[in-house]
Regions:
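Conserved acetyl-CoA-binding loop-helix of GNAT-fold acetyltransferases
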Residues: 93, 98, 104-117, 128-129
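Short, Lys/Arg-enriched N-terminal segments with co-localized hydrophobic residues
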Residues: 1-8
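A short beta-loop-alpha structural element at the N-terminal edge
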Residues: 10-24
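Short loop segments at secondary-structure junctions
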Residues: 70-71, 101, 164-168
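A conserved beta-turn-beta hairpin within the catalytic core of GNAT-like acetyltransferases
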Residues: 82-93, 103
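Active-site rim helix/loop that mediates acceptor-substrate recognition in acyltransferases
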Residues: 27-78
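C-terminal "cap" of GNAT-fold acetyltransferases
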Residues: 150-187
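Conserved active-site alpha-helix within GNAT-family acetyltransferase domains
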Residues: 121-125, 130-156
Length: 187
């Protein structure tokens, strides 16, 4: 059952006690039904990634947020430390997950807006992500290569995106690298 709108939503920092609910959000949000070409898939990759980022100490806790709907964790956004030219000078957004039954009612957008505000308040110069080129530009994201930040793999520039924040300064450029948990996904 999909809801048409949400009556009451609270965005807050994630707490240690939210870990199981956050995992459940990502498992559900990234699950794919079986098709003729592929078997069903749980969102274990994204859920494990969030768990690994947390275990490695690479999450930026002030920016990792949950959305509660009627007291239940229904969405989550992870923000982790990222590197440019091997310096930990940026943060990366993702995964961003929302329970399927409350998708398309503004929870993901609210989480993105709130986490961008939190990153800006912390003095982060920019937020980088690998994401859908028609969803993220509404939040001010554009190709990272336009700002001198190059992706770690051969992703199209329309998918590797950056949003400058108030602390952005000239001279920040070079090859981008995610936290180690992202790099282990390729293993």
């Amino acid at each position: 059952v999909r809801v048409a709108r949400v009556a009451c939503m609270l965005i807050r920092r994630e707490l240690p006690s939210d870990a199981d609910a956050i995992r459940a959000v990502h498992l559900a949000a990234f699950a794919k039904p079986a098709t003729d070409d592929a078997p069903a898939r749980e969102g274990t990759l994204e859920a494990d990634l969030v768990d690994d980022l947390r275990a490695d100490g690479d999450l930026v806790g002030e920016c990792c947020l949950v959305a509660e709907v009627d007291g239940v964790v229904a969405g989550h956004v992870a923000i982790s430390r990222a590197f440019v030219a091997d310096q930990p000078v940026l943060v990366a957004l993702g995964p961003l997950g929302v329970l399927p039954e409350v998708q398309r009612v503004g929870i993901g957008s609210a989480l993105v807006h709130a986490t961008l505000g939190a990153a800006d308040a912390l003095g982060e110069p920019a937020v980088v992500l690998l994401g859908h080129p028609t969803y993220y530009p509404r939040f001010g994201f554009g190709p990272a290569v336009d700002h001198g930040i190059t992706p770690p793999q051969d992703w199209g520039p329309q998918y590797f995106l950056l949003r400058r924040l108030h602390a952005w300064g000239d001279g920040l450029s070079g090859p981008f690298r995610y936290a180690p948990a992202f790099e282990r996904l390729d293993d």
